[in-house]
Amino acid sequence: MRVKGGTVTRARRKKWLKLAKGYWGHKSIGYKVAKQAVVKSWTYAFRDRKQVKRNFRKLWISRINAAVRPLGMSYSQFINGLKKANVKINRKMLSELAIREMKTFEMLVSISKSSK
């Protein structure tokens, strides 16, 4: 008698369809298309985990630059001055200070200006 392996096949297909739950159209119903969509989504997820770091760094830099320009400096001059003054504070914290604690940020700008 021929063994068709129905339960194993059904379980495997069910696993892929469960991963594709919430996808639009045939991507959540059809096994082959669902499997392709899930694998593609993993590719996007891998790529975007790297990109999110770049995007946040860009955001922080543009925020710092926007906060430092009215105080008479450019971003690069500000960062260079902080490095010369041996102030070790990362860009994330600098951008948060620029948004929430403007007085503290202005103090850092004055430190950066004086260290030239």
UniProtKB/Swiss-Prot annotation:
InterPro entries: Ribosomal_bL20, RIBOSOMAL_L20_CS, Ribosomal_protein_bL20_C. One of its GO terms (cellular component) is ribonucleoprotein complex. GO terms for molecular function: rRNA binding; structural constituent of ribosome. The keyword Ribonucleoprotein applies. GO terms for biological process: ribosomal large subunit assembly; translation. Gene3D superfamilies: 6.10.160.10, Ribosomal protein L20. Keywords: Ribonucleoprotein, Ribosomal protein, RNA-binding, rRNA-binding. HAMAP family: Ribosomal_bL20. Binds directly to 23S ribosomal RNA and is necessary for the in vitro assembly process of the 50S ribosomal subunit. It is not involved in the protein synthesizing functions of that subunit. Belongs to the bacterial ribosomal protein bL20 family. This is Large ribosomal subunit protein bL20. The gene is rplT.
